[in-house]
Amino acid sequence: MIASALDRALDWTVFPGYTSLGYRLRAAAWDGGIPPGALAGRTVLVTGVSSGIGEAAVERLARLGARVHMVARDPERGATALERVGSKLEDSGIEAGSRLELERCDLSDLNSVRGFAADFAPRAPQLHGVLHNAGVLPPGRRRTPQGHELAFATNVLGPFLLTNLLLSSLRAGAPSRVVLASSGGMYTARLRPDDLELERREYDGARAYAHTKRIEVILAELWAERERASGVSFASFHPGWVDTPGLESSLPRFHRLLRPLLRDADQGADTAVWLLATAASEQRPGAFWHDRRPRPAHRVPWTRESDAERHRLWNELARITGWSEEEKGGR
């Protein structure tokens, strides 16, 4: 009861709850860890693996027995991350070659996503987990090869298309789990289905990022509804404030001021790994999680979207990506 009260207090005060202190206080009350070998024989795909949370998640998933496909935009940086993780596994007596495989895909480029899915799906006829960790917070408005705003393309369009194209493999691997890395910043954002790329206002990278993170939370809920009978579960999560190269480059002042209090990458990856390795997301379909507990998707009423707006979002994403229900992996 005391632990529950402390958790609620940390959740609502935000500042301590998102720091390393909040993680340590909550972790002290958890009942045990993830059983060794929880993912033995299972295949998991992780995006955004070149550093930080993604790299930490890859290592932990591999240690739990998973065969982890590491998806990187930059093959050189991805190979360096694979070497770092592989070296740690080998030092622990785990054969890295049987646990890790590097893949190349640029989530911001829809052609790259389609090409990767077409190549990967036959190699993974049964897929048991996906962690969408790749993300970007641009300093200014930047365009992708298809002309879309970079944060929207990387954080939303790529994951939307890739997940739908891999649904056949996920269904074949059921019970399987898909986890999307969102952010506490999404609490400030309301879905704008009539302006998904925020073209009607002066560009602000943090605002664009928060909007994409709100969309990710909604997508987890929508997929959970659509796939409730298929054995594929969906969840989104907030990793907390984590000391990563991405945070340092995108929010340098925030990083500099709070660095002593930031979580390390392993703490940031914890909830994602826990969701992929346990049945928690199956018990709370589509929920938004932080530190192994479901959290409210909204803090204030004016960020809530209507059912019509959610439906419009799905249809717009399908139109923009060119994905249809009839495609392989569709319903």
Feature names for model-found ranges:
Residues 43, 50-51:
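Conserved glycine-rich cofactor-binding loop
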Residues 64-80:
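Conserved glycine-rich Rossmann-like NAD(P)H-binding loop of the short-chain dehydrogenase/reductase
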Residues 91-100, 119-132, 138-143:
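A glycine-rich helix->loop->beta "capping" turn
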Residues 75, 102-118:
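The beta1-alpha1 cofactor-binding region of Rossmann-like NAD(H)/NADP(H)-dependent oxidoreductases
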Residues 35, 135-152, 171-229, 238-258:
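Catalytic loop of short-chain dehydrogenase/reductase
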Residues 4, 8, 12, 21-23, ...:
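C-terminal helical subdomain
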Residues 1-45, 190, 306-331:
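Non-catalytic terminal and boundary segments that flank Rossmann-like NAD(P)-dependent oxidoreductase
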